[in-house]
């Protein structure tokens, strides 16, 4: 057997109890403006993963997203770490996924609190969660730490800022996982 094929088999599959089982990925994302949604769709296609959109029960308006206004909805939510915006409840069996690629826009150097809502709504026990984000200029900050308490039985790792959203950037990132 070709050595490269063996390597590919070991890298792309999970070994459990003497059997190789294809690991299954889910790309879950929240996008208020459409930027993260575009990136998430490209990641799902490249990773051959299922796609799940995290949607707010009350959609965000342009005024809600005005970070310059301290009374805007996003500013109020981000100033209260206990805030958990309601999400649309959707049926999904998280037990069928090994790895979750979780995407969101960066708000105030971290994930929007709606991501905490998502992590507290579903069971992520034993899951690997890799973060990706879009941002106008800030990085992940303390995002991993802020999210870990919402999914304490999962392993959450900082992935990548995918601001350009080019096919090559996304392809390279997915291959690096």
Q: Can you describe what each PLM-predicted range is?
A:
Residues 130-163:
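Short, glycine-/small-residue-rich phosphate/pyrophosphate-handling segment
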Residues 108-109, 137:
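Acidic catalytic loop of the alpha/beta-hydrolase fold
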Residues 7, 11-99, 109-111, 116, ...:
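N-terminal beta1-alpha1-beta2 submodule of the flavodoxin-like/Rossmannoid cofactor-binding fold
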Residues 104-105:
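Glycine-rich, N-terminal phosphate-binding loop of Rossmann-like dinucleotide-binding domains
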């Amino acid at each position: 057997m070709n050595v490269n094929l063996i390597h590919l088999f070991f890298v792309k599959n999970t070994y459990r109890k003497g059997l190789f089982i294809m690991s299954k990925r889910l790309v879950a994302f929240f996008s208020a403006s459409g930027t993260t949604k575009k990136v998430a769709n490209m990641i799902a296609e490249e990773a051959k993963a299922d796609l799940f959109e995290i949607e707010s029960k009350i959609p965000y308006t342009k005024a809600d997203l005005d970070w310059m206004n301290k009374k805007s909805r996003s500013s109020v939510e981000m100033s209260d770490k206990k805030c958990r915006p309601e999400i649309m409840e959707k049926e999904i069996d998280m037990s069928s996924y090994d790895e979750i690629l979780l995407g969101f826009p960066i708000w105030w150097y971290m994930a929007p609190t709606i991501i905490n809502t998502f992590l507290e709504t579903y069971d992520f026990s034993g899951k690997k969660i890799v973060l990706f984000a879009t941002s106008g200029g800030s990085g992940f900050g303390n995002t991993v730490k802020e999210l870990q308490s919402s999914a304490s039985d999962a392993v959450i790792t900082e992935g990548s800022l995918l601001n350009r959203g080019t096919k090559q950037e996304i392809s390279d990132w997915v291959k690096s996982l």
